[in-house]
């Protein structure tokens, strides 16, 4: 959904209206300095006229009725040294709105080699977001990663084909004729233009301009059943991390605990490798300056396994500090929910935390 690109549309329009980057910087602030970060600094890692933007911004706003504004959640895990049982605990709650029909349904899948319970999405087998089996459990929050880019493209018509400009040369664009079947209505014919950045979703290439969207989910997509099955069969946190290797979209945070005493935080999904400039606005697709260079390697995504502080908290706040070597995103939620969870956890008597305590913290949010 386009809600991930709405901040870029807003900043692009402000840049046009306010007349420059300095004016924009006074209006749009980044993540507040000193606010809580999921994976703190010091963690080691391996490794022109913009036609169509106004209509795209309007379309994104109209799409909000589908419920995408209700994203966000809380999740945390704590070390066994802080619990009455001596084993780690994990807690998570979804901030979904009251959907009808509901987006989540609780399922319990039990068969030889599999015993898992959690939240499933209708039409998709397995439980991936909030779930546990006999050995490992996890809670999910939205990762707020910037995985969509908007590319303003230059087009021309000629020689019986449509072309777009890239690095001073003209390339053939792919043009598809699609038919949308409408129940109880007439079919709708649609021409779709595709560049190497992605499909054009705004503007009119015949006029010379269009806006293409780049999104990891537009490629081979997410093999959800494969990831869900591997996750439900995982026996510990490391196996769960491996299960998420094939996950593409959306990018999520996971608070995790297992029966071997491991706890912590995992980030899962495909995040394009590119500069932070892509995150601020719609970019010029014809220059070659804003290209993707693959995806952040799965083993180098933000991760905290058995952190020394004894807990891991993810409440949609920034996931990695400035020393993280890759650009992840700009639009994170301020720390306030995460800081409240942290305070409540630290108020608990060390070595005495229970499931009931976790439930009370949920009720405090």
List the model feature ranges, each with a label.
Residues 11, 86-87, 98-102, 107, ...:
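Short helix/loop capping segments that flank catalytic or ligand/cofactor-binding pockets
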Residues 122, 148, 249-348:
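Hydrophobic alpha-helical segments
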């Amino acid at each position: 959904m386009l809600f991930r690109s709405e901040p870029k549309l807003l900043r692009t329009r402000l840049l046009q209206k306010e007349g420059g980057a300095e004016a924009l910087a006074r209006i749009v602030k980044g993540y507040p300095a000193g606010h809580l970060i999921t994976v703190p600094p010091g963690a080691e890692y391996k490794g022109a006229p913009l036609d169509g933007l106004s209509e795209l911004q309007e379309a994104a706003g109209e799409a909000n009725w589908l419920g995408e504004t209700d994203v966000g959640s809380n999740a945390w895990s704590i070390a066994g040294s802080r619990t009455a049982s001596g084993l780690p605990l994990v807690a998570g709650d979804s901030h979904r709105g009251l959907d009808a029909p509901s987006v989540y349904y609780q399922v319990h899948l039990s068969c030889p080699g599999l015993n898992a319970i959690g939240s499933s999405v209708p039409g998709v087998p397995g439980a991936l977001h909030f779930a546990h089996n006999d050995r490992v459990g996890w809670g999910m929050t939205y990762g707020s990663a910037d995985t969509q880019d908007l590319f303003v493209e230059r087009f021309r018509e000629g020689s019986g084909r449509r072309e777009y400009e890239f690095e001073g040369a003209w390339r053939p664009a792919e043009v598809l004729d699609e038919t949308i079947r409408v129940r109880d209505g007439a079919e709708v014919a649609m021409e779709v233009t595709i560049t190497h950045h992605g499909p054009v979703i705004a503007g009119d290439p015949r006029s010379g301009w269009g806006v293409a969207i780049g999104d990891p989910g537009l490629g081979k997509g997410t093999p959800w059943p494969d990831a869900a099955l591997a996750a439900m069969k995982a026996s510990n946190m490391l196996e769960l991390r491996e299960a998420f290797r094939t996950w593409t979209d959306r990018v999520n945070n996971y608070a995790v605990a297992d029966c071997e005493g491991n706890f912590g935080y995992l980030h899962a999904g495909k995040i394009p490798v590119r500069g932070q400039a892509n995150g601020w606005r719609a970019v010029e697709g014809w220059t070659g300056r804003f290209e993707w260079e693959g995806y952040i390697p799965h083993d180098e995504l933000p991760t905290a396994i058995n952190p020394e502080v004894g807990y891991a908290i993810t409440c949609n706040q920034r996931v990695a500090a400035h020393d993280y070597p890759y650009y992840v995103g700009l639009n994170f939620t301020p720390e306030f929910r995460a800081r409240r969870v942290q305070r409540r956890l630290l108020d608990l008597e060390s070595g005495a935390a229970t499931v009931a305590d976790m439930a009370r913290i949920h009720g405090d949010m």
